Regions:
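Binding-site signature for planar aromatic cofactors or substrates
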Residues: 1-217
Length: 217
């Protein structure tokens, strides 16, 4: 039997100075850019890792970690297999939520909104920036499908390596590309002492402008 774990002992205290409204940028994308830059330059591993939550048409949720591969005023971009579970869910229910947690900085960002595919040109540009092995992997894996053994992937990789051996530039697989989460709400969370954290939520208005509110922790 596994040793019993006392969950009440799994606790840490937050010690940051917190956030003030006057310090927050009126544009949440600019505020995110500041926080993301801090996370990257702090040397945090996988500073662009984020949890992506999707749901089926009937509302059954699922979540997984993906990598943020770009952001601008249009939204937040990640790439994947369109035929994967998340791809099928996004096709049926094109809304998603993202959560990024930088534990050493005691910061979290939550993003929610509708989802759209990136252009084929954007997908090609990113695909061709990837290492060749990763490009081959996109051709090899039928993501989320059941397979009998690892050797099936290894055999498929050998097959694709041979198939594309004479091609310096690999084609973009038709089933692979990017998604953009177009934000409707973005929340910035900063840990504080006594669990009285600072939370600021930006909500996009109909005219495209952002409204910012402080939320209770």
């Amino acid at each position: 039997m596994r040793d019993a774990i006392d969950f009440s002992t799994l606790r840490r205290e937050y010690e940051t100075a917190g956030l003030r409204r006057a310090e927050m940028h009126p544009d949440p994308i600019e505020q995110f850019a500041t926080w993301f830059s801090t996370a990257v330059h702090s040397g945090l591993p996988d500073a662009n890792a984020m949890t992506l939550a999707t749901a089926t048409k009937s509302g059954k949720p699922s979540a997984r970690v993906v990598l943020l591969k770009g952001f601008d005023q249009r939204g937040f971009v990640f790439f994947t297999n369109y035929d994967s579970d998340k791809g099928r869910e996004l096709k049926a229910n094109p809304f998603a939520a993202l959560a990024i947690y930088w534990m050493p900085l005691e910061r979290q960002v939550r993003i929610s909104g509708r989802v759209e595919k990136t252009s084929r040109a954007e997908s090609k540009e990113y695909f061709h920036s990837r290492p060749r092995g990763s490009q081959l992997g996109a051709w090899v894996s039928r993501q989320s499908e059941v397979i009998d053994a690892r050797r099936i992937l290894d055999a498929k990789l050998a097959e694709m390596t041979e198939r594309f051996a004479r091609q310096k530039v690999l084609e973009l697989p038709p089933h692979w590309g990017g998604y953009r989460v177009v934000p409707e709400a973005i929340e910035f969370w900063q840990g504080r002492a006594n669990r009285l954290h600072d939370r600021f939520r930006y909500t996009r208005q109909k005219d495209g402008r952002w409204n910012m509110d402080r939320l209770a922790p």
